[in-house]
């Protein structure tokens, strides 16, 4: 049986997040629903228990103040992966610092690629559909008139669980508020 993976995300429950969720459904209607989010720690196995990971999150995030990020332009990770995303402009260095601080102890993991603060729009099956999705997403995002600023104050620790015999469902485990300790579990 495959080990579950864990991640730390900041959900976007605002007009920008709704825009991305609607765009994702349009670009790839077969994908299961995935809430719009910024990834602080990409998926990884734990180097210990869930409890020890939550303790690390509580300790480190409790000492971090909430901060604002601004969403930038639509970009793609092609040819590395067929992923279309919105780059984080202002606040990206703060996200990177938080990522580095949290990549320790039970959450420590050598990631395959360098950490790039971003909001994933969609991951396609291959490069050609990703390029098409990129063009469409870039055009739509240029016409988005809502706020591109996001206050990061609450993060969510999630686990990939099995549904229909495959690891493909992310479950919220704990909510962590920056500047304070764990809120719920």
Show where each model-derived region lies:
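Histidine-dependent nucleotide/RNA phosphoesterase domain, centered on the 2H-phosphoesterase fold
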Residues: 1-185
């Amino acid at each position: 049986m495959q080990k579950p993976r864990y991640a730390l995300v900041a959900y976007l429950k605002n007009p920008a997040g709704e825009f991305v969720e609607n765009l994702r459904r349009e670009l790839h209607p077969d994908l299961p629903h995935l809430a719009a989010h910024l990834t602080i720690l990409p998926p990884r196995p734990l180097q210990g228990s869930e409890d020890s990971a939550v303790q690390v999150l509580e300790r480190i995030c409790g000492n971090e103040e909430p901060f604002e990020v601004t969403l930038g332009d639509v970009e793609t990770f092609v040819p590395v992966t067929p992923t279309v995303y919105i780059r984080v402009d202002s606040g990206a260095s703060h996200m990177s610092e938080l990522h580095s601080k949290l990549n320790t102890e039970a959450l420590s993991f050598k990631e395959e690629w360098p950490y790039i603060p971003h909001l994933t729009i969609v991951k396609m099956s291959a490069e050609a559909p990703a390029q098409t999705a990129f063009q469409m997403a870039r055009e739509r995002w240029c016409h988005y008139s809502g706020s591109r600023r996001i206050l990061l104050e609450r993060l969510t620790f999630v686990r990939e669980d099995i549904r229909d015999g495959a690891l493909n469902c992310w479950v919220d485990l704990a909510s962590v508020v920056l500047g304070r300790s764990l809120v719920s579990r």
